[in-house]
Each structure stands twice: as C-alpha cells, then as structure tokens.
Amino acid sequence: MPSRTDELSASLIRNINDVSMTRLLREPNYDAKGARLAQGTVAQKLGASFDVLEPGKCGCPYHLHHAQEEMFIILEGHGTLRVAGEMLPIRSGDVIFIPPGPDYPHQIVNTSDTQLKYYSISTRETPEICEYPDSGKYLAEGSLKSSKPFGVINRHTQGLDYWDGEP
C-alpha cells in the first residue's frame, strides 16, 4: 500500500526526465515531441507540457484561443515566435505570455539548427474555441460532468444556418 508521501508525490509532482514523450510528425512543417505533465495529477485549472521542436519545424499551427491563456518558458535553443502577424526572436531564458483573444494568434517555430526545448503552460478553460487564421478553421470543445466531451473542427465558411434541421 502506498504511503501518504508516495500518494502526494504521484499526484503533485512530475519530472520531465521520467515522463514519456509522444511524437507529432506531419511533414513538411511539423515535428515535435511532447509530454503532458498535468495528466494524472490533481491539477484542475492548469495544464503543462514539456515540448521539443526539431530544427526548422513547428509544434502546432498558427492559432488563437478564446478562453485559455498560455505561457511558454524557453529552456534550451532559440527560434521564432510568430505572433500577431510579426516574427519575434526567442531564446533560452525567455518567458512568453499569450493572453486569450483575437489580438495574439501565435506559433512557435524552431528556426535554428538545434532542438528547441520549452514548457507550455496554460489555463484549462472550457468551453474553448480555438481559431486557425491560416486555414480559416476553428475548433470548439467543451465538456460537462454529466456528458461526453464535445469537440468539432470546421471552417467558418462551411457553417450551417441556425435553424438547419430544426422542426
């Protein structure tokens, strides 16, 4: 039977050296490894991951959040923060703050010839809408404790009339 110390440690602490990394590869632009750190913890409103981008690659598409706020802590390497239509240099030691809303679509790009390692920390607000300006898509997701999680990805131009399918 686990001790109270073991239980607390397992529910409160993650070490990046002990978590398994999952690779996201979608050529030609995306090649990242990541570990979700908050899964299995008692965290309720914060999420975190440890991310590694390969040279010349991105981890996710250019996007913005309607509800979630994000922070990135650059641990090793350098690259570019594409944000609000601008390209900003980033490097080891930088802490990046991205509030929700339409003013700060963002994407981290490894523009160097070595790996870029960083923490991604975010609030876990639901419901959430995420927009992708380059492709015109949106993601809407949410969940209620009494139902299955809800999620849909669509394009703005493919929407339905409010009354579609209603009696």
Predicted regions and their residues:
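Short acidic-glycine-tyrosine-enriched beta hairpin
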Residues: 85-100
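Short, conserved, surface-exposed binding loops centered on an aromatic residue
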Residues: 39-42, 52, 63-65, 73, ...
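Short, conserved beta-strand element in jelly-roll/cupin
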Residues: 50-55, 64-83, 121-125
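A short, N-terminal "cap"/entry segment at the start of jelly-roll beta-barrel domains
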Residues: 1-45, 131-167
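Short hydrophobic/aromatic patches on the structural cores and recognition surfaces of FHA
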Residues: 77, 93, 108
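Conserved short histidine dyad/triad with adjacent acidic residue
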Residues: 31-36, 49-65, 103
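Ligand-binding loop in jelly-roll beta-barrel domains
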Residues: 100-128
